[in-house]
Amino acid sequence: MGSPNLKMMLDTYHMNIEEDSLGEAIVRAGDQLGTFHIGENNRRPPGRGHIPWDEVVAALRAIDYDRDTVMEPIVHMGGGVGNLLAVWRDMTDDRDLDEAAREGLEFYRGKLAAAETGCAGPPASEAKEGHS
């Protein structure tokens, strides 16, 4: 890109569709990664799908990523975003959105902390079981 003011953004939802390896894509981005969007393969908050979070956080750690991370769950029908993205079912599991966001953030922070200490942390399936 050649400009110190121009960076790229990666999004785990889209990476899940397009990349062979999320970790390799993050490492290839390296210091050009300026913003990172986190969300599951099913657009739910982290810990409620099958994104390989241990691989993701290991790659972020490998490139010393310390910039903005944005959680981007899209779980409601209707409204501007729901209509634009054609969300056809409610994916909140009858849960409060603020609580779901907090749980997703706690899950992601736990994965980051585990990567720092060298422990894998709980698998995503455990996070899902606790919140069904």
Residue ranges: model-predicted function:
Residues 1-132:
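Histidine-acidic metal/acid-base catalytic patches
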